[in-house]
Each structure stands twice: as C-alpha cells, then as structure tokens.
Amino acid sequence: MTDSFEQISAHNEELARDIVERASARGVTVSTAESLTAGMIASTIADIPGASAVLRGGAVTYCDEIKHRVLGVEQETLDRYTAVSHQTAREMAVGSLELYQSDIAVSATGYAGPGGGTEDDPAGTFYIGWAHRSADGGVPVVDSVRCHYEGDRSCVRAHAVTEALGRIAFVLNSME
C-alpha cells in the first residue's frame, strides 16, 4: 500500500522541522533548485518557524532554457544527457549553491507523470542532486541519486521532496 499525499506531506514537515532546527543551530544555510517539484522543497522548509535563518532562496527552473540561464546548467549537458539526469541534477545543485551563496543546495528534476518519461526513465523517475561547501572552502562536494516512485503526480512530487530533504539531512549529519 502506498502512502497518501497527506501522509507524505506530514512526514516532510517533520523532516523540514529537524533540518531548520539543526541548520539554524549550526549557522548553516540552504537553497533549492527545483523543476518537477516547482518550489515544494523550499515551501516545505519555509513553512517551519525559524526558516528565515536557514533558507537563502529557491529557483523554480521548469524549462531547460531557465536551467541554463538562471542556474548555469551547461547547454551541452542538457543536449547530451537531458534535463532528467544525474548530470543535470548535479549542475542544478551547484548553480543554486553559487546563486544563493548557501552552504547546502539541493535540486530536483524528473518526470512526475502521468505522461512523459523515457524507456530508461519512465514517469515517476526523478533525480535529486545536492552540493555543499567543502571543509576547506574549495571545490563543492556534489552528488546525486536516481529515484522512482509509482503513484499519481502529487505523490511522486511529494516523494521527491522527501528525498531532497533527506539529502539535506544527510549533509547536515556529515557536518557534525
């Protein structure tokens, strides 16, 4: 049995509350770059009291042109790998990190469904990218994960928020 949108959202609120509390206590800032979630990650964080000490901003970059112009995703990356790929998710996260000068950035790009997708990445597939400043302040640490969830559009998007918040929590844990 799959969780309902309401159940997923309640879980996301708990994750966001933990992130805001821990990031605020450490003076760590967060930013987002969102495509399929269209601002849901930033909104979930912003719903928590005290988020203004943590959330630097979020970019909704639904189309490829804006991913390129706002976040600096290379056109070659979009052409070669598509907007729904590890490479694009990583470049989106780095773009958010630089744009907002945050300590941690997370990105989400994918196919929420019910249509769209490819044979390799069907509807319900998304990529979460994350980037954070290295301990020595040098080149950012960047990674991504591919996820797939069956369900309606709203649940796929809510699961993407869960995965993104989980990556922020993961990075916060690594900073302890």
Q: Which residues does each PLM region occupy?
A:
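Short alpha-helical segments enriched in small residues
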Residues: 1-176
